[in-house]
Amino acid sequence: MDIYDLLGKIDHTEDQDKVSYSAGVVFAMSLKDMGFEDLKYDDFIDGMKTIFEKTTPKISPKKSIDIFNNYVMLLRQDLSMKNEEEGKALLEKNRENPKIIELESGLQYEILVQGNGEIPKITDEVEVEYEGYLLDSQVFDSTKDIGAQVFRISEMIEGWKEVLTKMQEGSRWKVYIPSHLAYGENGAPPMIQPNATLVFIIELNKIVR
């Protein structure tokens, strides 16, 4: 299936409009994930025109790459510290809630529904339904539209390994996973930033083995 099949049966002009708009959306999402919040759009567009229209650059491409990479590195450091502080603040606040249990690793969970089935082992495959949230309540992953999924526990992030091997089949938990048990300093672009604490609502349907 080519790009035109994916976009639908529309004329060529509309295809290019959609592709161009979508390219802008995808690129903006990537920049926002890196921490860009106050781009000067005129300069940004000038930079793009320089490449596409082959005009004389105000700054050489090589120098532009260096400037961009250095700035991204500084942004990631700032984002990493900000996310770490926000995660610690949430976990600290959760300690005041008697319904939330904290494990030695720092992972926290609240039992929403207590199942009465088996508890899986690390080597098991399990069928789960879940929603994953960033700390601003934005959903970054969900089975809501695709239905229950089957995973091998040993291949999942550390936080999921730990919590799934404590849940009974039929259980539904709200889980708070600190960054060191999730995606750590690297994050998982484009949605999950470095040192992000994640919140999941996980329902363990059954052990598939």
Which residues are covered by each model-predicted region?
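Cross-family detector of peptidyl-prolyl cis-trans isomerase
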Residues: M1-R209
